[in-house]
C-alpha cells in the first residue's frame, strides 16, 4: 500500500474550502500529530522514563493518574491550544479549558484510554470527539448526534487511527518510517454474524436481569435462541474492543450494575461513549445504553458516565429488546435448554 491515501490528504479532501470543516480537519490533524509523538513515547516505555507508576493524584473521575496519563494529556492540549477552539474537555481535567467562544468547534478527549494496561504491555489508546459551536448552547451539553467527527487511536502492534467525519469510517495505520498515517481500510462495515461478545463476567452477580438474559442466550450456543456457539472476549481496553468489533464484528457490553457508583456504568459519555457510538453507527452498527440510543443522550456534567452496548446492530437491538420487553427472554427460551454457566 505504498501509494495509500495519507490522513492529511483525507482531511484536506473532506474540508475543501468550508470554514467549519477546515476547523475540524485542523483538529484531527493536530491530534494525529500528537498521537505520533505519543506512540513513540509509549513504545519506548521505561527507556523514555515512563514507569506507569501512580503520581499520587487522581483525575476528575477519581482514577489514579499515572505519569503517562499526565504527559499524554499535556501533549494533546499543547497541540489543540494552537487552534481556534471554544472549549476543550479532557478526562484528566476537572474543568473545561475555555478558548474563543466564537470559535467553530470544541473537542472532548481521553488522552490515554486504558492506562492501567501500561504495566502489562497491553493495548492503550486515545479517543476524541469534535462538536460544533451552537449559539446559545453551552459546550458539551448537546446530544451526541451533533458530533462533526470522532475517532480513536490504538497503540498496539501497529498504531492505527479510526476516523469518522459523518460519512462512513476509515482506518489509517502509522507508517513509522514516514511518520504519517496511511489509509488501509475505507468505508468499514461491521460484520453482522460474528458470534462473539465481550463483557467482564466477574460482575455477573451485579448485572440487571436483561444483561444476564442476553449473556445466557449467548452461552446457550446452538441449543439456545441465538442458535450459534459464541466466544467471549474481554481485553480490558475500550479502544481495543472497538477496533476488534469494527474488523471482526460482535458486541461489547459495559452495562450499569448494582455496585455502588456503577448504576450508570463506568465509561464517560462525552469522550468515550459519544465518539464510540458515532463510529459504530457510521460503520453500520449500533450503540445503546440498553434503553436509549447513546447519540440521543446529552451530558449534564463533563464527566458524566453512561452504560454502553456497542457493536453489530442485531446484537445491540437484542439487548435493547430484553431491557424494554421483560417477556422477550422467556418467549425465546427453548423448553428443554440446558442450564447456562451462571444459572443456579
Swiss-Prot record:
Cofactor(s) essential for the protein: Mg(2+)
InterPro entries per the UniProt record, alphabetical: FBPase_C_dom (IPR044015), FBPase_class-1 (IPR000146), FBPase_N (IPR033391), FBPtase (IPR028343), Fructose_bisphosphatase_AS (IPR020548)
CDD domains linked to this entry: FBPase
Recorded coiled-coil stretches: none
GO annotation terms (biological process): fructose 1,6-bisphosphate metabolic process; fructose 6-phosphate metabolic process; fructose metabolic process; gluconeogenesis; reductive pentose-phosphate cycle; sucrose biosynthetic process
Note describing how the cofactor binds: Binds 2 magnesium ions per subunit.
SUPFAM superfamilies noted in UniProt: Carbohydrate phosphatase (SSF56655)
Pfam family, one: FBPase
Binding site for Mg(2+) 2: 110, 113, 272
Residue sites binding Mg(2+) 1 per the record: 91, 110, 112
EC number(s) on file: 3.1.3.11
HAMAP family: FBPase_class1
Name of the protein in its database record: Fructose-1,6-bisphosphatase class 1
Source organism phylogeny: Bacteria, Pseudomonadati, Pseudomonadota, Alphaproteobacteria, Hyphomicrobiales
Recorded name of the encoding gene: fbp
Amino acid at each position: 500500500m505504498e501509494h495509500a491515501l495519507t490522513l492529511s490528504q483525507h482531511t484536506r479532501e473532506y474540508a475543501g474550502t468550508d470554514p467549519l470543516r477546515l476547523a475540524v480537519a485542523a483538529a484531527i490533524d493536530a491530534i494525529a500529530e500528537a498521537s505520533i509523538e505519543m506512540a513513540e513515547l509509549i513504545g519506548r516505555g521505561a527507556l523514555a522514563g515512563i514507569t506507569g507508576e501512580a503520581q499520587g493524584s487522581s483525575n476528575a473521575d477519581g482514577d489514579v493518574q499515572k505519569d503517562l496519563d499526565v504527559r499524554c494529556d499535556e501533549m494533546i492540549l499543547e497541540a489543540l491550544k494552537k487552534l481556534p477552539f471554544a472549549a476543550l474537555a479532557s478526562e484528566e481535567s476537572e474543568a473545561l479549558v475555555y478558548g474563543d467562544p466564537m470559535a467553530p468547534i470544541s473537542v472532548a478527549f481521553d488522552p490515554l484510554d486504558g492506562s492501567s494496561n501500561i504495566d502489562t504491555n497491553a493495548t492503550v489508546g486515545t479517543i476524541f470527539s469534535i462538536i460544533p459551536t451552537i449559539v446559545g448552547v453551552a459546550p458539551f451539553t448537546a446530544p451526541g448526534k451533533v458530533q462533526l467527527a470522532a475517532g480513536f487511536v490504538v497503540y498496539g502492534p501497529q498504531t492505527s487511527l479510526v476516523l469518522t467525519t459523518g460519512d462512513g469510517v476509515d482506518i489509517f495505520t502509522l507508517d513509522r518510517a514516514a511518520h504519517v498515517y496511511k489509509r488501509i481500510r475505507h468505508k468499514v462495515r461491521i460484520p453482522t454474524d460474528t458470534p462473539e461478545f465481550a463483557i467482564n463476567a466477574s460482575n455477573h452477580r451485579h448485572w440487571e436481569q436483561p444483561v444476564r438474559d442476553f449473556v445466557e442466550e449467548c452461552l446457550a450456543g446452538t441449543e439456545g435462541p441465538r442458535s450459534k456457539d459464541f466466544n467471549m472476549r474481554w481485553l480490558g481496553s475500550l479502544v481495543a474492543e472497538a477496533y476488534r468489533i469494527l474488523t471482526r464484528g460482535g458486541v461489547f457490553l459495559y452495562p450499569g450494575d448494582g455496585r455502588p457508583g456503577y448504576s450508570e456504568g463506568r465509561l464517560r459519555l462525552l469522550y468515550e461513549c459519544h465518539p464510540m457510538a458515532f463510529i459504530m453507527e457510521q460503520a453500520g452498527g449500533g450503540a445503546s445504553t440498553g434503553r436509549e440510543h447513546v447519540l440521543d443522550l446529552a451530558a449534564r456534567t463533563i464527566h458524566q458516565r453512561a452504560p454502553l452496548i456497542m457493536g453489530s446492530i442485531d446484537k445491540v437491538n437484542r439487548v435493547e429488546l430484553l431491557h424494554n420487553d421483560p417477556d422477550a427472554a422467556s418467549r425465546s427460551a427453548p423448553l428443554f435448554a440446558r442450564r447456562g454457566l451462571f444459572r443456579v
